[in-house]
From Swiss-Prot:
Keyword flag DNA-binding: no
Protein name: Small ribosomal subunit protein uS2
Main location: cytoplasm
Entry-linked PROSITE patterns: RIBOSOMAL_S2_1 (PS00962), RIBOSOMAL_S2_2 (PS00963)
Compositionally biased region (Acidic residues): 211-242
The organism's taxonomic lineage, starting at the top: Eukaryota, Fungi, Dikarya, Ascomycota, Saccharomycotina
Pfam families: Ribosomal_S2
Species for this entry: Komagataella phaffii (strain GS115 / ATCC 20864) (Yeast)
A GO term from the CC aspect: cytosolic small ribosomal subunit
Family: Belongs to the universal ribosomal protein uS2 family.
Record PANTHER family: 40S RIBOSOMAL PROTEIN SA
Annotated S-S bridges: none
Alphabetized GO MF terms: structural constituent of ribosome
Length: 263
């Protein structure tokens, strides 16, 4: 698929894709995913062509931007590494997100509390999100999926070839997809201007790591306050001047004392 020059993959985005290991696919490869393989390493890992990954990101963004109501686009992720990413995607694009376990019947049973009628769904992994894909096929909902080389592509309309098992890879794909959607909608009018949101915001973070970081920041803040208090006390308290005990007292005038007693 040829893209206009303005949609070409930039050197900065290519570096991001390589740094996040988006190009490292699975060792097993489905027949329908062979066109996305750049080469196979001696250890059996299939290297994904990031040029084709970028083309599919642009195609998916154009489909998403064509939906009149952004809330009709639902991002789904049962995989833990993708739950934070889909929530951020829905927040930035004004869409909907299903993070965590997908409740069966969400797209087919209108009695359920979580019932939705989306016009498009995006899944993080066709294997872990198979229930959402299956129900979407029943009601003719188009499906965009992040697919690895060993991922099934049944009922998937647009496959974005990438490493859908790494937390950095998943987060970066959702980040680039969000940014491209905002560019097509005109929210980011200048394609050469950098987005103020960093890719790190889409990366999965371990809850224990978050708690540890918060504790370290709290300890650092307490230490800084204690240092400030010490400085204030030192400034307020001044050491008294030392007395000169070697200095001799002025001689007493005994004549004046005798005259005073006489009076």
């Amino acid at each position: 698929m040829s893209l206009p020059a303005s949609f070409d993959l930039t050197a900065e985005d290519a570096k991001l894709l390589l740094a996040a290991n988006v190009h490292l696919g699975a060792k097993n490869c489905q027949v329908h995913n062979e066109p996305y393989v750049y080469k196979t390493r001696p250890d059996g890992v299939n290297v994904i062509n990031i040029g084709k990954t970028w083309e599919k990101i642009v195609l998916a963004a154009r489909i998403i931007a064509a939906i009149p109501n952004p809330e009709d686009v639902v991002a789904v992720s049962s995989r833990t590494f993708g739950q934070r990413a889909v929530l951020k995607f829905a927040s930035h694009t004004n869409g909907s997100a299903i993070a965590g376990r997908f409740t069966p019947g969400s797209f087919t049973n209108y009695i359920t509390r979580e019932f939705k009628e989306p016009r498009l769904i995006i899944v993080t992994d066709p294997r872990t999100d198979s229930q959402a894909i299956k129900e979407s096929s029943y009601v003719n909902i188009p499906i965009i999926a992040l697919t690895d080389m060993d991922s099934p592509s049944e009922f998937v309309d647009v496959a974005i070839p990438c490493n859908n098992k790494g937390k950095h890879s998943i987060g970066l794909i959702w980040y680039l997809l969000s940014r491209e959607v905002l560019r097509l909608r005109g929210v980011l009018p200048n394609r050469t201007e950098a987005w103020s949101v960093m890719p790190d915001l889409y990366f999965y973070r371990d809850p224990e790591e978050i708690e540890q970081t918060a504790e370290e920041e709290a300890e650092a803040a307490e230490g800084a306050e204690f240092e400030v208090e010490e400085e204030e006390v030192e400034q307020e308290w001044q050491e008294p001047a030392e007395a000169d005990w070697n200095a001799s007292a002025p001689p007493a005038d005994w004549n004046d004392a005798a005259n005073a007693e006489a009076f």
